[in-house]
A protein has these predicted regions:
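Phosphate-end processing signature that detects enzymes handling 5′-triphosphorylated RNA
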Residues: 1-229
Length: 229
C-alpha cells in the first residue's frame, strides 16, 4: 500500500505552560472536533529525522532561511506495519507537507541507507526524495517523540495540536523499538495552529484568550545535541 498526500497551510507555534494547556484542552474539547487518534490523554508521535552529512537542514532552520526542508519517517505505534515518509518544506509563511504511506520493510531499508528502494515505488514524490537524499548524503540523525492532543475544524483545513513530554535520542534510532530509551528535551508544551488562508474568527478568539508566546522553535532542532554546543 503506497498512499500519497499533499498539504499546504500556514503553521504557527506557541509555547504554553502546563496550566494553560489544561485550560485550553477543556475549551477545545467542547468547541472543536477531536482527532480520531485522540485517546483520553492524546496519542504518541514518534519521528526519525534524516539530515545531510553536515546537518544542513538543522542549520538552515537555525539560520532562519526562508526556504528549508525536513525529511522524516513518522509512526504513531512502534509496532505498526506502515509508516509515513514525509517531506516538509517551508516557503515564507506556508508549509508544504508531502507524505507517502510505506511498508515497514521499505522504511527499514531507508534507515539502512538504501535509498534506491524509493525508485521501486514508481511514484514521482518517491523519485524526488531519492534524488534529494542520495545527492545530499542524507543520514538518519535523531528520534523525536512526544504526546499529542489534536483538534480539527473542517473549514479551512484547521488543525490545533498540543504537544507535550518531548523526548529524543541521537544514540539509538530504532524507531520500531517500543521500549526505546529517550532523553527529556523540555518541560514546555507546544501549541501549534495550522490552517489554510485564514483562521476562523471563533477559533482565533479561543487562541487569543490564552497566555502564550509565539515561537519558531523546531522540535527537531531542540532535540539535537548540536543545538547545545
Amino acid at each position: 500500500m503506497i498512499d500519497q498526500n499533499v498539504i499546504t497551510r500556514v503553521e504557527k507555534k506557541y509555547e504554553i505552560n502546563v496550566f494553560t494547556a489544561m485550560s485550553l484542552k477543556n475549551i477545545l474539547c467542547k468547541t472543536l472536533v477531536q482527532d480520531s487518534y485522540n485517546k483520553d490523554d492524546g496519542y504518541m508521535v514518534r519521528s526519525l529525522y534524516f539530515d545531510t552529512l553536515y546537518n544542513n537542514d538543522y542549520f538552515d532552520k537555525e539560520d532562519g532561511l526562508e526556504y528549508r526542508r525536513k525529511i522524516r519517517l513518522r509512526t504513531y505505534d512502534p509496532k505498526a506495519q506502515f509508516l509515513k515518509l514525509e517531506l516538509k518544506q517551508k516557503e515564507g509563511e506556508y508549509q508544504h507537507k508531502y507524505s507517502l504511506t510505506i511498508p515497514k520493510s521499505i522504511a527499514q531499508r531507508l534507515i539502512e541507507g538504501h535509498y534506491e528502494v524509493l525508485k521501486e515505488l514508481n511514484n514521482d514524490f518517491a523519485d524526488r526524495l531519492y534524488t534529494i537524499m542520495q545527492t545530499n548524503l542524507y543520514r538518519p540523525k535523531c528520534i523525536v517523540e512526544y504526546n499529542r492532543l489534536a483538534y480539527i475544524v473542517k473549514e479551512n483545513n484547521t488543525r490545533i495540536t498540543i504537544d507535550s513530554d518531548l523526548k529524543s535520542s541521537e544514540s539509538n534510532i530504532d524507531i520500531f523499538n517500543p521500549s526505546l530509551s529517550l532523553n527529556p528535551v523540555t518541560s514546555k508544551t507546544i501549541l501549534e495552529v495550522k490552517y489554510n488562508n485564514f483562521l476562523l474568527s471563533y477559533v482565533k478568539d479561543i487562541i487569543d484568550s490564552v497566555n502564550k508566546s509565539q515561537t519558531s522553535a523546531s522540535k527537531y532542532c531542540m532535540s539535537r545535541f548540536i543545538s547545545y554546543l
